[in-house]
C-alpha cells in the first residue's frame, strides 16, 4: 500500500512514461512529455492535500471543436501492476476489452474478426467491449487503455473516449492541468482511485467528474452506464459537450435538464455479483439511446462514457445526466416516469453465443437494500445485456398498454346499422303516401310514385310490371307486347318472337320497341305523325281522312274545313273548341259574321224580318230584295216565291 500513498499525479506520470500509447502522439498533434510537468498543478489556484485530490477529465474536443493538449504522465504504478510487459499491447486492428479473469488471460490478444464482430453487434464501429476479457491497449487513433485498482476492479472504455478520474467518497477538490488529464483523438484512459473504482469519459460525449458523494455525468445525446465491477458502452451519436461539476462548484445553468432525457435513480439497487465468462453485469442500469440516466449506489463510481453510447451511472449518492445539460443537486430526485420514453418501452434480451451483445436488452428490477423511505417515489429499472441475470427478475412495466382494436366496425356497430336500416324500411312502408289507383295485375292499391308504373294505358305496381320470361322489372325500359304478354328486349330478340311481332302501318318495319296502336293499326311512336306538319301525335288528339292519312286537328281543319262563300276563308272552330259553326245558304258555307245583307248589311238569320231573300246569288233582306225588283209589294208573296232556310 506504500505506492498508493504516493501522489496520484506522480503515479500517473510514472505510468505514462513507459506506456506504448505514446506512439499516438508522434503524429505531431501532441507535444513530447515534459519532465517539468510531473507534479500536479493546482486548478483555479486552489490547493489540495495528498490523499484528497480529484482529477477532472479533460475533454479531447473543446466546444469550438479544437483539440486539447494531452499530458503524458499518468498512473504508472497501476500500469506496472497490470501490464508487466509492454509487448502485450494491442495493435491498430484490435480493441481493448475489459478483463475479469486472472493473470493468465490478461495477455490474450483479440483477432480482427472478433473485434469487428463485436463492434457491429453493439451498433457502433468502435464501442463494443466484452467484460471478462483481457484488457489490451490499441495503438494509433483507436487506442483504449484499461487499468485496474488494487482490488482487481476494471473499467471498460470506448475507443472514442477520454479520461475521467474518480476517487474515494471523501475527495472534495478537483484540479485540471496538462498532467492531471489525458486525452487523445480516439483513446481512453482509466485512472484508479484509492482502491475504489475507475471512470472513463468519452472525448466526444461529455466532460464528467466525480467528487465527494455525488458523481455527475453528462453527454449531449448519451446516458451513462457504470458498475462496481465493470461497464459496457452502447451506441448513440453525440452532438455537443455537457459539463459536470461538484455540487459545491455548480452554477445555476448546470442544473438544467434536457427535455428529451429521463432519469431514474437506482441507488436502491444492490451491487450484485457478476459472471466473468458470460460478462453478465446484473446491476448495470442502461439508459436509452435518447439519454436516460440511471444512478446506483456503490463504494466508488465507475463511469464509462462512449461517444455513441447509452450511459448509466452508479454513484455513492446519485447521478445526474441529460442531453446537453445536467443537474448537480444530489438531493433532487428525478424518478423515471413509467410510460416515458416510448423508444425504451420494449426492451428484449438476446445475446450471441460468443458473448457479444446485440442491441436488445430486458428490463430488470432489484430489491431495495438501503433508503427504503424513498422506495415509493422512484422506479428502479435495471438493464441487463446478458442472457443470464442472477440478481434480477423480469417484471411488467408500471403501466398497461390498451390492446388495439381491430380495424373496421365492431359487431355491435354492425348490429346497430342493421337495426337502423330495418327501422327505416318499416317507417317508409307505414308512411302515408300518395294514392295512384289499383294495379291491373294484382288488384291492390298503388301508393307512392316509386311504386307506380304506367304502361299500355294501364297502371301497375313497379314489381308487377315485369317480363313474362325472366321476371325483370320493366319500368323505364323497352318492352314488347306479344298477345297481351310483355317481354324485355333480350327475351324478345333472342327467343323467336320476331315472327309474331307486329309491323308498323306507316313504314312497314317490325316494331322492336314501344308500340302505338290507333284506329286498329300498330305504329312506331316515331312514325305516328301528322302528314302536314310532321309533328308526333303520341298522346295528342288527331284525326284521319278517308284515306287513313293522319292529321293533327289544326292541319285537318286547314285542309278539310269548308270555305266561306263570302270571304273565301276556311271556317275553323273557335279557339279552344273543337266544333265548327257555319251558315249554309244556297248550298254555300258562310261564317256567321259573313252571313248578312249585301245592300244594307243587316245580319241575317231565321228570325222574322232578318231572313235572307237571295236574288241572283246575292244575300239580301226582304226590303232590299223588293227594291231591286222595282215592283210593288204584294200583301202576300206569290206561292211560287222560294223560301230560304238557313242551316246552322
Swiss-Prot record:
Pfam families in the record: LIM
Alphabetical list of SMART domains matching this protein: LIM
Keywords, comma-separated and alphabetical: Cell junction, LIM domain, Metal-binding, Nucleus, Repeat, Repressor, Transcription, Transcription regulation, Zinc
Main location: other
Biased composition (Polar residues): 197-213, 220-241
GO cellular component, one term: nucleus
GO terms for biological process, alphabetical: cilium assembly; cloaca development; cytoskeleton organization; determination of heart left/right asymmetry; determination of left/right asymmetry in lateral mesoderm; establishment of mitotic spindle orientation; heart looping; negative regulation of hippo signaling
Cell compartment(s), UniProt: Cell junction, Adherens junction; Nucleus
Disordered, as annotated region: 27-56, 142-291, 306-327
Domain LIM zinc-binding: 437-498, 502-561, 562-631
Alphabetical list of SUPFAM superfamilies matching this protein: Glucocorticoid receptor-like (DNA-binding domain) (SSF57716)
UniProt GO MF annotations: metal ion binding; transcription corepressor activity
Low complexity bias: start-end ranges: 158-171, 178-192, 252-267
The protein's role, per its UniProt record: May monitor slit diaphragm protein assembly, a specialized adherens junction characteristic of podocytes. In case of podocyte injury, it shuttles into the nucleus and acts as a transcription regulator. Plays a role in the regulation of cell morphology and cytoskeletal organization. Acts as a transcriptional corepressor for snai1 and snai2/slug and plays a role in regulating neural crest development.
Protein family membership: Belongs to the zyxin/ajuba family.
Protein known as: Wilms tumor protein 1-interacting protein homolog
Annotated source species: Danio rerio
